[in-house]
């Protein structure tokens, strides 16, 4: 059995490689429950709910720490009791395996918090 996505580390993506094909993205999507493909399979997105603003902010801060540790950064929007996280690799204008690694890490972080 291969290593779970949330246990993997992002690999540097310098651009010049093609983004994942839809079929490749859909295969990895099975390993990231709750996430959806958006923008014609060019972005990975998930919304989370929380008990209040403070918990949503704590989650967003945690995602920020993960992003800095891995050198891969999402788009995040949040407000009272909710947050939406989107992953894509800007250098290739689409999805890379790193996006799925980070989605799995994001889900693991959220699972460790009591959501709303």
From Swiss-Prot:
- Reaction catalysed? (4aS,6R)-4a-hydroxy-L-erythro-5,6,7,8-tetrahydrobiopterin = (6R)-L-erythro-6,7-dihydrobiopterin + H2O
CDD domains xref list: PCD_DCoH_subfamily_a (cd00913)
* A Pfam family recorded for this sequence: Pterin_4a
* Highest rank taxon of the organism: Bacteria
> Which keywords label this protein?
Lyase
**Enzyme Commission no:** 4.2.1.96
Q: Which GO terms describe its molecular function?
A: 4-alpha-hydroxytetrahydrobiopterin dehydratase activity
InterPro entries, per the entry: PCD_sf, Pterin-4-alpha-carb_dehyd, Pterin_deHydtase
User: Would you kindly state one Gene Ontology biological process term found in this protein's UniProt entry?
Assistant: tetrahydrobiopterin biosynthetic process
Which HAMAP family does this UniProt record tie to the protein?
Pterin_4_alpha
Recorded family membership: Belongs to the pterin-4-alpha-carbinolamine dehydratase family.
The protein's name: Putative pterin-4-alpha-carbinolamine dehydratase 1
């Amino acid at each position: 059995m291969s290593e779970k996505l949330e246990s993997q580390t992002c690999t540097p993506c310098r651009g010049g490689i093609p983004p994942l094909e839809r079929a490749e993205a859909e295969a990895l999507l099975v390993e990231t429950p709750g996430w959806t493909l958006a923008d014609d399979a060019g972005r990975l997105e998930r919304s989370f709910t929380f008990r209040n603003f403070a918990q949503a902010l704590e989650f967003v801060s945690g995602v920020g720490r993960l992003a800095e540790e891995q050198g891969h950064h999402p788009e995040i929007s949040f407000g009272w009791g909710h947050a939406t996280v989107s992953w894509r690799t800007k250098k290739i204008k689409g999805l890379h395996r790193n996006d799925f690694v980070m989605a799995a890490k994001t889900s693991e972080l959220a699972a460790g918090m009591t959501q709303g």
